[in-house]
Amino acid sequence: MFAAENGLKGDPRLEAISAAIRVVPNFPKKGIMFQDITTLLLDHKAFKHTIDIFVDRYKDMQISVVAGVEARGFLFGPSIALAIGAKFIPLRKPGKLPGKVISESYELEYGHDRLEMHVGAVEPRERVIIIDDLVATGGTLSAAMSLLESQGAEVVECACVIGLPEVKGQHKLKGKPLYVLVEPSGLDEFC
Amino acid sequence: MQTIIISPLVSHRLCLARAVPCNRLLNNHHRAPPSIRLSNHRSTTSLRLFSSAAASRDSEMATEDVQDPRIAKIASSIRVIPDFPKPGIMFQDITTLLLDTEAFKDTIALFVDRYKDKGISVVAGVEARGFIFGPPIALAIGAKFVPMRKPKKLPGKVISEEYSLEYGTDTIEMHVGAVEPGERAIIIDDLIATGGTLAAAIRLLERVGVKIVECACVIELPELKGKEKLGETSLFVLVKSAA
């Protein structure tokens, strides 16, 4: 669900966050309006608002794990984890994590990719949120969920700064709630 | 979608429930310095680890004369994985530090205490593990966070800097306009080994007129002499470890 539909309607912080995100047309290929969050990271106030909104939502939900998807999930996840007293678990591309891992494959537009997590990072019945900068089809987040659930963890919610139109109206991803702050900027001419 | 379990090539110390203290802390002037014969992962020459006093002069640690009590916990929370990514390398795995909420909090606090109120407006972090430590520090000290990335990841106009690897070269990139001339920056990464990546990051920022106040890492591998590559820029680390 979008934050505006879930208690934050009219919250000026959401507008500041949205305004701070830069749209780069035709990256990585023609036709894609890339949502660039690096400009959000340059705006200290807006970046802080982003983290504060997630922290306010999750701090009293007994979340013991924040899992972040490489690499842009790493930009948001750790700050949230630190503020709510949770562990941070990086979910990485193949071959990056040095210890024993479990792996889940997921579909791309052409072909597939894999996501890995260290064995033992999460314990059964831990309550987890998964963070990424943006959700489009939900393929990556679904793979992340599978990794965590295979270890007996409970995925409480997936959270992203930006949610593409495909997910609007969908409050759930694979049966789990999805929480998104803003819609993409600059899509008007494409819809 | 299939869940696959993959074992690493070698892994002797897989304790995630309990961190294995594998790092040597070179911070006590009063103890006799350890003389340790170590094998360098690049050659078969054994190196004698230099004395703790010399180590303190070469790069500053978070411990001056008295060790900060938080350092030992941070050091012991880092897992060492032998022979990753290839034989001979003792990989310093900070993912176990991130699982220890107190150690991770203390790590950030140590950097924040050092850099707040120093007029630092930019925290630059090197992909990908610099992305884990940099943003919390930036948020706490009121600075921007600037990601420095491998080629073709950043969507906008970039400037690039090439640097040498053992075999070949690599490149890091930064968005044009992310920083302005005259800004004061720190550069963050989880670990400094040979110093190649950090040196490239320094060059990239200096090309656009930024003053690098310091490079800051959780871990240093002193035998690899990465500090020498940083030129005039000082280095601050929390933990030193054998390569």
Curated annotation (Swiss-Prot), chain A:
Entry GO MF terms: adenine phosphoribosyltransferase activity
Keyword Cytoplasm: yes
Similarity-based family: Belongs to the purine/pyrimidine phosphoribosyltransferase family.
Entry keyword annotation includes Glycosyltransferase: yes
HAMAP family: Aden_phosphoribosyltr (MF_00004)
Enzyme category, top tier: transferase
Location within or outside the cell: Cytoplasm
Pfam families named in the record: Pribosyltran
Protein name as annotated: Adenine phosphoribosyltransferase 5
Catalytic activity, reaction form: AMP + diphosphate = 5-phospho-alpha-D-ribose 1-diphosphate + adenine
A GO CC annotation given for this chain: cytoplasm
Disruption outcome: No visible phenotype under normal growth conditions.
Pathway: Purine metabolism; AMP biosynthesis via salvage pathway; AMP from adenine: step 1/1
Ranges in a coiled coil: none
Record EC number: 2.4.2.7
Alphabetized Gene3D superfamilies for the sequence: 3.40.50.2020
One of the GO biological process terms: adenine salvage
Oligomer and partners: Homodimer.
Known role: Catalyzes a salvage reaction resulting in the formation of AMP, that is energically less costly than de novo synthesis. May contribute to the recycling of adenine into adenylate nucleotides and the inactivation of cytokinins by phosphoribosylation. Possesses low activity toward adenine, but can efficiently convert cytokinins from free bases (active form) to the corresponding nucleotides (inactive form).
Keywords tagged on the record: Cytoplasm, Glycosyltransferase, Purine salvage, Transferase
UniProtKB/Swiss-Prot annotation, chain B:
Transit peptide stretch: 1-52
GO molecular function: adenine phosphoribosyltransferase activity
Effect of G168E: In apt1-4; reduces activity 3-fold
Family matches, as Pfam families: Pribosyltran
Enzyme class, spelled out: transferase
Gene3D superfamilies (UniProt xref): 3.40.50.2020
Transmembrane stretches, start-end: none
GO cellular component, one term: chloroplast
Catalysis: reaction(s): AMP + diphosphate = 5-phospho-alpha-D-ribose 1-diphosphate + adenine
pH dependence comment: Optimum pH is 8.8.
E.C. designation(s): 2.4.2.7
Protein keywords: Acetylation, Chloroplast, Cytoplasm, Glycosyltransferase, Plastid, Purine salvage, Transferase, Transit peptide
Consequence of gene loss (knockout): Male sterility due to pollen abortion after meiosis. Accumulation of free bases of cytokinins and enhanced resistance to exogenous cytokinins.
GO biological process per UniProt: adenine salvage; AMP salvage; cytokinin metabolic process; purine ribonucleoside salvage
Pathway given in the UniProt record: Purine metabolism; AMP biosynthesis via salvage pathway; AMP from adenine: step 1/1
InterPro entries: Ade_phspho_trans, Adenine_PRTase, PRibTrfase_dom, PRTase-like
Annotated NCBIfam families: apt, PRK02304.1-3, PRK02304.1-5
Role this protein plays: Catalyzes a salvage reaction resulting in the formation of AMP, that is energically less costly than de novo synthesis. Contributes primarily to the recycling of adenine into adenylate nucleotides, but is also involved in the inactivation of cytokinins by phosphoribosylation. Catalyzes the conversion of cytokinins from free bases (active form) to the corresponding nucleotides (inactive form).
Subunit structure: Homodimer.
Family designation: Belongs to the purine/pyrimidine phosphoribosyltransferase family.
Note: Plants with reduced activity of APT1 and increased levels of cellular adenine show enhanced stress tolerance and improve growth, leading to increases in plant biomass.
Protein name listed in UniProt: Adenine phosphoribosyltransferase 1, chloroplastic
Organism annotation: Arabidopsis thaliana
Gene: APT1
